[in-house]
């Protein structure tokens, strides 16, 4: 039996045993088109998906609905993905987080262009992100990461 089958089986059993609802995923990304693409993909797998375009909007949604999994971009204006993870920890939310990021090009001190996605991704991993995905990534990897995060979330409770 493949690992993903075991993961889905465990998820289905635990979900059926605890409550009669679809697992919920909050997708946080300031790129609306990307957020909608992820939401459509996960909704087709049977998830109840909500999108937030910033960490601040996500914090409100988390307080109101407490999603089962959060998928967040690292780099966003205002409250970014790392700040959101800090907020989750400070407010004692035990929600598995999947962190996503693309290459981010910054202008250095002397005008040089540098790619800085690794520092944010390393910080997210050290803060307990259950999965770290680099854009672009495939649908199967996203679906598997969410299934694993849900299984991880079940063991937390």
What do the predicted segments below correspond to?
Residues 36-40, 44:
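Charged docking surfaces used in two-component/phosphorelay signaling
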Residues 53-57, 80-83:
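Acidic catalytic/metal-coordinating carboxylates
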Residues 76:
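Receiver (REC) domain active-site loop signature in two-component systems and cognate sites
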Residues 29, 73, 101:
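Active-site residues of response regulator receiver
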Residues 83, 104-131, 140, 144:
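Alpha4 helix (beta4-alpha4-beta5 surface) of REC/receiver domains from two-component response regulators
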Residues 65-71:
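Active-site beta3 strand of CheY-like receiver
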Residues 60, 82-94:
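Short amphipathic alpha-helix used as the core "switch/output" element in two-component signaling
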Residues 1-24, 140-157:
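Non-catalytic signal-transmission and effector/linker regions of two-component phosphorelay proteins
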């Amino acid at each position: 039996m493949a690992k993903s089958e075991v993961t889905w089986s465990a998820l289905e059993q635990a979900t059926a045993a605890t409550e009669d609802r679809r697992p919920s995923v909050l997708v946080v990304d300031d790129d609306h088109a990307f957020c909608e693409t992820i939401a459509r993909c996960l909704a087709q797998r049977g998830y109840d998906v909500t999108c937030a375009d910033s960490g601040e909007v996500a914090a409100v949604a988390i307080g109101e609905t407490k999603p089962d999994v959060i998928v967040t971009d690292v780099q966003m204006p205002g409250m970014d993905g790392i700040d959101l993870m800090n907020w989750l920890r400070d407010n004692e939310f035990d929600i598995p987080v999947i962190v996503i990021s693309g290459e981010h090009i910054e202008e250095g001190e002397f005008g040089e262009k540098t790619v800085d996605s690794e520092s944010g991704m390393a910080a997210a991993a050290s803060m307990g992100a259950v999965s770290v995905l680099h854009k672009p990534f495939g649908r199967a990897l996203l679906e598997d990461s969410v299934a694993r995060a849900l299984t991880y979330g079940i063991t937390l409770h």
